[in-house]
Amino acid sequence: EESDSEGNNFIYKRRQNGSGAHIGGITAELKLGIPDIFDVQLGYTFQKSQYVEPEQWSDDIEAQRTMFRAPDHYGYLNSNFYITKQLRASLFGTYTGRMLVQHAAHTDIMGVEHPDTEVVTPSFWDFGVKFGYTFRLSDTLRLELNAGVKNIFDSYQRDIDMGAGRDSAYIYGPALPRTYFVGIKLSM
């Protein structure tokens, strides 16, 4: 914390690049299908992300090599099932494994002060489903009506900070709650 000549106080938070990192892992992907019946694509990644030297981001927390916001496990699924020539069902989603995140000192909505901490997040399954029906308007023009649900399991961060003293960078997990949608697609 510093003060200027007029007595105004300023708090500076400074970050600098670390000593380097070692990141390694393996990814497996699979794609299969039968034309006009179904297609499925899925992938899984296992990785390890560590700093070369232990990093310390807070005087209250012991230095460590584990990288923040870098899950060791994650995966995805994209699939389509062609029920009829016009009707298609899609299942899609992602898996994000547990990860270590920083939770900076903050004051909650009750006025209670909390010190810097590190949190291991839960894992998240973020799946959705979509149904689409295509109308053939002419030899070259198609109209698709679709509807679905994103984040079916309503996976989200349960410990979100609130209030003026919150740690606004303490965000993890799926960006949207369970969301229903409808759409129209015109293609040639």
Model segments located where?
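Conserved C-terminal beta-signal and adjacent last beta-strands/turns
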Residues: 65-188
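Surface-exposed loop/turn segments flanking beta-strands in extracellular/periplasmic regions
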Residues: 1-15, 61-63, 111-114, 166-171
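Gram-negative outer-membrane beta-barrel transporters
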Residues: 6-105, 156
